[in-house]
Amino acid sequence: MNIDSIVRELIGQASGITADSRSVKPGFIFVCLSEAAKGFVPDAVKAGAKFIVAGNAGGLPHVDHSQIIICPMQHDLYYKLASEFYHASQPEFVAVVTGTNGKTSVADFCRQIWCLTGHTGASMGTLGAIVGNTTLPSSTSFTTPDAVELHKTLSTLRDLQVKYLCMEASSHGMAQKRLYGVKASAAAFTNLSGDHLDYHGSMEKYWATKQKLFSEVLSCEGCAVLNADSEQYGELRELAAGRNIITYGVDTGDVKLARLERNTQGHNITVKVCGEVIYDGAFPVLGKFQISNLLCALAIVAASGSGHRDVPIDRLASPRGRMELIGDRIIIDYAHTSDALKHALTSLKWHGFPQKTVLVFGCGGDRDREKRKTMGMVASQYADVVIVTDDNPRSENPETIRKEIMLHCENAIEIPDRGDAIHYAVNFAIRNNYVLLIAGKGHETTQQIAGKSVEFNDGTAVRRCLSEMQYA
């Protein structure tokens, strides 16, 4: 029996689908996406699972054989079931953006632009699913949600009369086919640098995964939004041949800059689309790299047909935790790759902050260890004072992570507790007239330590410290 036949057989008999035994309810289909998941089959059956799907029969506990469906391509079946269960319902226009850095900002700028121009727009990704200014409840923290959560959210957005959506596509999400069944009206690419190599194994495999957005997800009638400034532009243009293509770039592209000035509050810019000036004024967002993200967002908006000529760019705001300015000298940014950290640090000088720079950062545990070296080197080269602290150590020994970073920035100050590190850095920066960058966690509201989720937010820690100092 092929996948389509199995879907037709099961979809009308099920009350829900999940790959998490803890989410099973009576009448659900429980899909074992890994061999380890078979160990939770008894829990799923006890909770009322009507069908059990597995890739093979090996290791399955004894259950009623009428409940078991064996499908060697159980991952594909899972995504197909998720799409069909929610009737492939989604907003009229869905743009999907991929790339190492910038995805969240692009999606957020798109949502802001659509809303500011009188449309019902939404974004979905690392910050959650946001409609207008309201974040929807979610059970996931993934950039690209699990297939069931994704299609459930898409269906909810449709029910809320959302017409335009821009969502992020992570490399994990692409590799695990979480976007199966999404009808992408546009696919956009930001940039490529090293990340998640612990998962993908090599830059070649990482890049190949990113390309799947254009070869497997973007519809034949869809639009490819390509970064003309990127090294990957030529390869992606060939991959997108036969589809509509909109290019963007600082110096060249259908959407490009004609003028750029910067200050400590952001930028003043002139933007052209196909040779026509569509905006001349302020862009009140910090970060030189945010210019490229804005241009990408404008290209997506142009592809959507919602209108790109009267966009109030001067009313755009930084996404939460993305070059977020607190007071006049403290910036919080999500930078968690060496490339992103370099861009964040160099942007401070580029914007004309006259002060020296204090940097607070760490690296995540159970993730690509090579980043500890490269981020340490960037910190040592571009920051005047470096404070190494804990990020999300997860199951690793935090001290080991810090030591591996400090091998490459020998003069760094080590303060294990992130709250203590921020308190020290805020006091140091204000008393010595430095500018402070706190990198790595951005908008996150928890810290993952030894299997526990501890409530913590960089911005909250900064504001508490400023309040104690009666500075703000």
From Swiss-Prot:
What broad class describes the main subcellular location of this protein? cytoplasm
Would you tell me the protein name for this molecule? Answer: UDP-N-acetylmuramoyl-L-alanyl-D-glutamate--2,6-diaminopimelate ligase
Positions that bind UDP-N-acetyl-alpha-D-muramoyl-L-alanyl-D-glutamate: S21, T143, T144, S170, Q176, R178
The GO cellular component terms are: cytoplasm
Stored HAMAP family: MurE (MF_00208)
Which E.C. number(s) belong to this protein?
6.3.2.13
The similarity annotation says:
Belongs to the MurCDEF family. MurE subfamily.
Q: Which cysteines are joined by disulfide bonds?
A: none
Keywords, alphabetical: ATP-binding, Cell cycle, Cell division, Cell shape, Cell wall biogenesis/degradation, Cytoplasm, Ligase, Magnesium, Nucleotide-binding, Peptidoglycan synthesis
Q: Which residues bind meso-2,6-diaminopimelate?
A: R367, D391, N392, P393, R394, G440, E444
Q: Which GO terms describe its biological process?
A: cell division; cell wall organization; peptidoglycan biosynthetic process; regulation of cell shape
Q: Which residues does this entry mark as bearing N6-carboxylysine?
A: K210
* PANTHER family given in the database record: MUR LIGASE FAMILY MEMBER, UDP-N-ACETYLMURAMOYL-L-ALANYL-D-GLUTAMATE--2,6-DIAMINOPIMELATE LIGASE MURE HOMOLOG, CHLOROPLASTIC
The UniProt entry, under Pfam families, shows:
Mur_ligase_C, Mur_ligase_M
List the ranges annotated as motif Meso-diaminopimelate recognition motif: 391-394
- Enzyme group, top EC level? ligase
